[in-house]
């Protein structure tokens, strides 16, 4: 309501790949937040309100709190073994600058109800471990195993969402099947 009352042109909900086929409560709440946010476009009166609600979905932001790389660097700088769940685990990441640029691109393209997903390459924990060991040295690995609610491989778009997805330049654009106004140039 605050966005509508203050005539905000575009409202952006920033989400995570954890929202795709969630296995735990965190992922489920991210999915629900994303759906509620973009579905807001279905309930506004376009004659009264001009606010467009869009969402962005990406992986880990490099250097953010909870990101694995700073944790690994700290362990290696302290000459401790790396604590990993599974070296075959894959994740997606985006830098702060890439995330900022992506937000700007999405605001330029957004018509309302879309979920914007950057094209990101997956990396494995083994790739990260190898690269960091080359820089800081190898102090061993403590494999603790995949934790409850974790996925071995995150995904950015579900199979069901693919039916409503546009492949557009450096991104994928998921349209709302109930309120799709997006058409790429």
Question: What kind of feature is each model-predicted range?
Answer:
Residues 39-185:
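Strand-loop microenvironment adjacent to phosphate/nucleotide-handling motifs in alpha/beta enzyme folds
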């Amino acid at each position: 309501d605050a966005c509508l009352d203050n005539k905000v042109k575009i409202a952006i909900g920033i989400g995570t790949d954890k929202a795709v086929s969630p296995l735990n409560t965190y992922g489920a709440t991210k999915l629900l937040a994303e759906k509620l946010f973009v579905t807001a476009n279905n309930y506004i009166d376009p004659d009264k309100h001009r606010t467009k609600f869009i969402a962005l979905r990406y992986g880990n932001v490099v250097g953010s709190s909870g990101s694995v790389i700073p944790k690994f660097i700290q362990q290696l700088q302290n000459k401790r073994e790396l604590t990993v769940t599974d070296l075959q685990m894959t994740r997606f990441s985006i830098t702060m600058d890439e995330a900022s640029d992506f937000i700007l691109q999405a605001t330029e393209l957004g018509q309302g109800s879309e979920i914007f997903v950057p094209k990101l390459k997956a990396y494995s924990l083994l790739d990260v471990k190898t690269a960091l060991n080359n820089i800081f040295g190898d102090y061993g690995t403590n494999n603790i195993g995949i934790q409850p609610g974790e996925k071995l491989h995150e995904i950015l778009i579900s199979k069901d969402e693919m039916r409503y997805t546009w492949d557009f330049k450096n991104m994928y654009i998921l349209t709302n099947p109930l309120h799709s106004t997006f058409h790429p140039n």
